[in-house]
Amino acid sequence: MKVIALVGCTASGKDSILKEALRIDKQGFIIPVISTTSRPARENEINGKDYFFIDHNKADEMLKNDEFLEYRKYKVADGSIWIYGITKNQIDIESDKTYICIIDLQGLKQLESYLKDVGKGDKLVSLFVDVKAQIRLMRALQRESDLTDIQVNEICRRNLDDYKNVIPGKKYCSAVMENNNKNDMYKCAMLINHVARNDDRWIKNIICMK
């Protein structure tokens, strides 16, 4: 068992990298970890594929029952509080597969602690997805059409939050990968497949090692 954790700011392309890595993995060796969230689904997001979407009451119940191995609460621009997290049943620690998840720095530290507690602390590889700030902002604005003022404010809030809670992960993660264009995205996806198969080429070809 191995866990690859992708860490990166809003609109850094983490989802695109993950999907491309799974597309390249023809043998199904990499298993995507699906996070659970209490935020509303975006257009075209599918429950059980992109996220497990739950309401606030269900989220509180799951927290009370200690079902999450990591989670974080976000207060968004309209005052709502959203929960994102990974449930313990998403990762089989006895499996011979490689799991891949998208996570923030706080969640990464919780995941790291959880894996150490179950004797799998050496099975975690964390990769920071680095993108120029201007590109991230443009992607965020283009991701949704006809943005309301509240949605624009939320994008701004996320970017400010990233500087505090995500960008420090660049120094914390095992390695850093640039993702400023489609070519970078493909390289990142290939590297993830090398990591999943214990292929040393990922170390030689990584864009920036810590």
What are the language-model segments listed below?
Residues 6:
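Hydrophobic anchor at the beta1->P-loop junction of P-loop NTPases
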Residues 9:
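P-loop (Walker A) phosphate-binding loop of NTP-binding proteins
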Residues 12:
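ATP-binding Walker
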Residues 15:
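Walker A/P-loop
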Residues 23-32:
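Post-Walker A helix-loop "phosphate-sensing" segment adjacent to the P-loop in P-loop NTPases
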Residues 37-99, 103-107:
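ATP-dependent small-molecule kinase phosphotransfer cores
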Residues 98-106, 119-143:
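Conserved phosphate-donor/acceptor-positioning beta-strand/loop module used by diverse small-molecule
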Residues 145-197, 202-210:
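Small-molecule kinase domains that catalyze NTP-dependent phosphoryl transfer to phosphate-bearing small molecules
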